[in-house]
Amino acid sequence: MSIARRTTLSKFLIEQQRETNNLPADLRLLIEVVARACKAISYNVSKGALGDALGTAGSENVQGEVQKKLDILSNEILLDANEWGGNLAAMASEEMETFFPIPANYPRGEYLLVFDPLDGSSNIDVNVSIGTIFSVLRCPDGKQATEESFLQPGTEQVAAGYAVYGPQTVFVLTTGNGVNCFTLDREVGSWVLTQSNMQIPADTREYAINASNARHWYDPVKRYVDELNAGKDGPRGDNFNMRWIASMVADVHRILNRGGIFMYPADKRTPDRPGKLRLMYEANPMSFIVEQAGGAATTGTQRIMEVQPTGLHQRVPVFLGSKNEVERVTGYHDEAK
């Protein structure tokens, strides 16, 4: 592809604004700012030990997880990049206990930005793909946000995306009109459109789950995975392969490209906690992307994007990816009720 014929993220968004007339200018600018912040995060991730950003920071986030230095740095990059542009009323991050209102000395906008600044950060020190996940909502209270302003079901998202910092840095985006992937051209610093209208195959022979937790799973998940593992001699009559990167962005990106099902179920170790992944920061944005690509996403009992949030850091079980497989494991949950 010649440089002159490349479609950059900026050009793509402007063309979308002209063609569909459903991409407001402030939302377009917000997406571009988030994408620029992801470039900065990518740069810091790629420096590794040379940037003195590996290892833990000696602190814990609101979930009680030990924070990596790059967790904190990535969070600061996103806050600093977005607080002054006039597009946002407030932000919320997986790394912060409460939401972040736009300071009074900056103009405020009508949108809310929700993000996981560095998903899969347990993989930082071993150089495995990690990423950033984000979601955009409208502020129902105009420009004066409260915590309640964020507690909207995923169906209210106006944009969602993620960046993967791997062999290439990619930025995957939906604004409710399909899913597109942009690759970072490091030489010129531009996001270049490399995949349009991405679609997840309805059927798959790959699944992603942390099998070390098998002894803790509830019966519907055990049944489903046992059938997959039985291969050609089992009830499915086919062989399936397991893939598990322990980085949601990397696992979902693989599924978006070649199909599969990603599962992070609730289990018996914490019966009072429904799952591990965060609804607002991980499950909702990824579900929006997956559904826009023709896939499905449920908690096992409910469409994820229809869950009514009750708190910023609410957790849910997650089953997402190829539609027929998600519907099958969801059906097993229905049968077990």
UniProtKB/Swiss-Prot annotation:
GO cellular component assignments: cytosol
Binding site for Mg(2+) 2: 116, 119, 282
Cofactor field: Mg(2+)
Major localization class: cytoplasm
Catalytic activity as recorded in UniProt: beta-D-fructose 1,6-bisphosphate + H2O = beta-D-fructose 6-phosphate + phosphate
Claim: Metal-binding is one of the keywords in the record: yes
Protein name per the record: Fructose-1,6-bisphosphatase class 1
CDD domains hit by this protein: FBPase
Assembly and oligomerization: Homotetramer.
Subcellular location: Cytoplasm
Protein keywords: Carbohydrate metabolism, Cytoplasm, Hydrolase, Magnesium, Metal-binding
Gene Ontology terms describing biological process: fructose 1,6-bisphosphate metabolic process; fructose 6-phosphate metabolic process; fructose metabolic process; gluconeogenesis; sucrose biosynthetic process
Binding site for substrate: 119-122, 210, 276
UniProt EC number: 3.1.3.11
Pathway(s) it belongs to: Carbohydrate biosynthesis; gluconeogenesis
Entry annotated with the keyword ATP-binding: no
GO function terms (MF aspect): fructose 1,6-bisphosphate 1-phosphatase activity; magnesium ion binding
Positions that bind Mg(2+) 1: 94, 116, 118
Gene name of the encoded protein: fbp
Family listed: Belongs to the FBPase class 1 family.
Record note on cofactor: Binds 2 magnesium ions per subunit.
